[in-house]
């Protein structure tokens, strides 16, 4: 179920402050965040965020198409090891 419109998008307070500080500084550095639940806002376009996936921070460069999505959508948490090899085919 979608979030009701009267509430507006959810963004952690510290995240908004970090983005504003990074926008003001001249050097471009990765902003480390743990808030995968936060919505990407238009103010974040052009910034690089390090989104935590449980082990490490995955760098995510925010583009216009990402606005309205959540940060967690762009940082996968599970690694797919592949399907098990067929033992019969391996012996041949």
UniProtKB/Swiss-Prot annotation:
Keywords: Ribonucleoprotein, Ribosomal protein, RNA-binding, rRNA-binding
Keyword Hydrolase: no
Name of the protein described by the UniProt record: Small ribosomal subunit protein uS19
GO cellular component, one term: cytoplasm
Source species: Methylobacterium radiotolerans (strain ATCC 27329 / DSM 1819 / JCM 2831 / NBRC 15690 / NCIMB 10815 / 0-1)
UniProt KW Nucleotidyltransferase keyword: no
HAMAP family linked: Ribosomal_uS19
Domain of life: Bacteria
Family, per entry: Belongs to the universal ribosomal protein uS19 family.
Gene Ontology BP term (one): ribosomal small subunit assembly
Entry-linked InterPro entries: Ribosomal_uS19, Ribosomal_uS19_bac-type, Ribosomal_uS19_CS, Ribosomal_uS19_SF
GO molecular function: rRNA binding; structural constituent of ribosome
Organism placement in taxonomy: Bacteria, Pseudomonadati, Pseudomonadota, Alphaproteobacteria, Hyphomicrobiales
Gene designation: rpsS
UniProt function note: Protein S19 forms a complex with S13 that binds strongly to the 16S ribosomal RNA.
Coiled-coil intervals, chain numbering: none
